[in-house]
């Protein structure tokens, strides 16, 4: 399973360099950047110190949605609670989650937001799972480079495992399930209940492969019973 690190609108070249260095140290190889050219500044390469190959391989995108176009499962980091988001995985909880996903997902991604404001609610909604680092309240944030290091360290075991031969098409099960669920809620005329819609969408990413397949079967049976 590929696991690119996505930085959304990083402002400081030094932070991009620090993130690249953290990735290199822990065995990660692919970085994507959204709406920023900070990685092109000399300071990024100076701080990267030996991780120039990661900077050289950076893929740039205009939007986060574009950066996720080939991603089957995405995890977004956030440092603060948003009222509409209720479940946050810790970095430690992500490892078993991704170890299960790697059996059927070809590409996952870990997303980091802006240094000053993080990810917008609209960007967080693009992710399958949200995660945050529990911290002491009087010092409630990590800088970008530190945050990337924390997550890369926690997930480094994934980089040491041999690749898994994925079943064709399985990686798209989650996205297909999201679309199917949204369509069903619309047919049931409950799509305007935003609280319920948010609750459903936030929990689909937590499903394992067997659960995802079973829910597809259940939705299929429900769809057959509904009038056209």
Which role does the model predict for each range below?
Residues 1-228:
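Post-transcriptional modification and biogenesis factors for structured RNAs
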């Amino acid at each position: 399973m590929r696991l690119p690190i996505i930085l959304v609108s990083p402002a400081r070249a030094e932070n991009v360099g620090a993130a690249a260095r953290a990735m290199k140290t822990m065995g990660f190889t692919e970085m994507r950047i959204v709406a920023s050219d900070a990685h092109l500044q000399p300071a990024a390469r100076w701080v990267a110190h030996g991780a120039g190959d990661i900077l050289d391989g950076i893929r740039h995108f205009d939007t986060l949605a574009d950066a996720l176009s080939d991603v089957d499962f995405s995890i977004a980091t956030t440092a603060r609670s948003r009222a509409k988001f209720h479940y946050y995985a810790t970095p430690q909880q992500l490892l078993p989650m991704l170890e299960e996903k790697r059996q059927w997902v070809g590409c996952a991604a870990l997303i980091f937001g802006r240094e000053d404001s993080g990810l917008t609610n609209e960007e967080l909604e693009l992710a399958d799972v949200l995660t945050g680092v529990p911290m002491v309240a009087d010092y409630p944030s990590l800088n970008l480079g530190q945050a990337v290091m924390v997550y890369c360290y926690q997930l480094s075991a994934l980089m040491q495992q041999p690749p898994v031969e994925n079943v064709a098409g399985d990686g798209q099960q989650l996205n297909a399930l999201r679309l199917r669920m949204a369509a069903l809620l619309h047919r049931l005329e409950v799509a305007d209940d935003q609280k319920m819609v948010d609750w459903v969408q936030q929990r689909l990413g937590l499903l394992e492969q067997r659960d995802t397949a079973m829910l597809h079967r259940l939705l299929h049976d429900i769809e057959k019973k509904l009038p056209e």
